[in-house]
Amino acid sequence: MSIEVVSKAVHKNARISPLKASQVLRLLRGKPVEYAMYQLSFMNKKAAVIIKNVLKSAVANAEQKGIDPTKLVILEAKADKGIMFRKWMPRAHGRATMMRKNTSHITIALGELQEATEEAK
């Protein structure tokens, strides 16, 4: 059996840190799409909601190409560092400190399971 990438979805600058998103993505890598959607629906994490939307988008991209969604497997699931939001927070005695909010680029690539033919062997 061989797997090739058929669709991809990216969410840029998601308002979650890459570390927290990658904890959820690590559980999904290499799993079938139906299983991953089921797992995400019961996960009690903010990242699960964001990742589920990205996964739905990747499945929709595959369906546009006419691929059966039941044969899809998650090949690549990663969270890269995005831009950092900075804003000033007032403090005592007229000072201010910078607040930093991390963002991440969440990428999910799906592949289709194909059975090897007898000629390829």
From Swiss-Prot:
What one GO molecular function would you report for this record?
structural constituent of ribosome
Q: Which Pfam families match?
A: Ribosomal_L22
Keywords in alphabetical order, please: Ribonucleoprotein, Ribosomal protein, RNA-binding, rRNA-binding
What does this gene product do? This protein binds specifically to 23S rRNA; its binding is stimulated by other ribosomal proteins, e.g. L4, L17, and L20. It is important during the early stages of 50S assembly. It makes multiple contacts with different domains of the 23S rRNA in the assembled 50S subunit and ribosome. The globular domain of the protein is located near the polypeptide exit tunnel on the outside of the subunit, while an extended beta-hairpin is found that lines the wall of the exit tunnel in the center of the 70S ribosome.
Question: What stretch or stretches form a coiled coil here?
Answer: none
Entry's family note:
Belongs to the universal ribosomal protein uL22 family.
Sorted alphabetically, which PROSITE patterns does this protein's record hold? RIBOSOMAL_L22 (PS00464)
Under InterPro entries, the record lists: Ribosomal_uL22 (IPR001063), Ribosomal_uL22_bac/chlpt-type (IPR005727), Ribosomal_uL22_bac/org-type (IPR047867), Ribosomal_uL22_CS (IPR018260), Ribosomal_uL22_sf (IPR036394)
Q: What is this protein called?
A: Large ribosomal subunit protein uL22
Assembly state and interactors? Part of the 50S ribosomal subunit.
Tell me which species this is from: Hydrogenobaculum sp. (strain Y04AAS1)
Q: Which GO terms describe its biological process?
A: translation
Q: Which terms in the GO cellular component ontology are assigned? A: cytosolic large ribosomal subunit
